[in-house]
Amino acid sequence: MSKRMMILAMASMLISHAALAQKVAVKTNLLYDATTTINLGAEVALAPKWTLDLSGNYNGWTFSDNKKWKHWLVQPELRYWPCNKMMGHFFGLHALGGRYNVGNVDVDMNLLGTDFSQLKDYRYEGWAVGAGLAYGYAWTLAKHWNLEAEIGIGWAYTRYDKYECQSCGQKVADDEGHHYVGPTKAAINLVYVF
């Protein structure tokens, strides 16, 4: 191999290694971690100011007194970074999809036509899809570590079966539909940037 080819090969390896900087990140949402929900996210750079974030989570546990917030959820998000990707302010457009089995949860809240207090007396099993807009900010903690905060609002459509009690009751509604408008994303992410 000629000296020129060797230099060219080494230069291309250095350039490709430098090109990986701020191109890929993995993350965990600390809010989901606090609720025992297993979650993992990844983000890849698409262009100088655009990234694609994909997060997924799973909670398959039944807690004491038969409380359950069982679900799996996938949330892809296209992000725009006004300054540098994976640092500072960002705006996102996200979608969501998943399944759930929720009951015996005491949440006394009525939000824009959704009565969450019914989760105490009934169990709901179904699926949901939706979309929303988000705003967030990423702080650099160290060379490879970031902390991200994000909030999103949007719409979700769900279809569900409704049961009388939390685990064994008779079905009282079959294949009902509901439109939800409100928060669709909340995250405090611990991020490792490659």
Question: In which residue ranges do the predicted regions lie?
Answer:
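Residues that define the transmembrane beta-barrel architecture of outer-membrane proteins
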Residues: 22, 34-36, 68-74, 87, ...
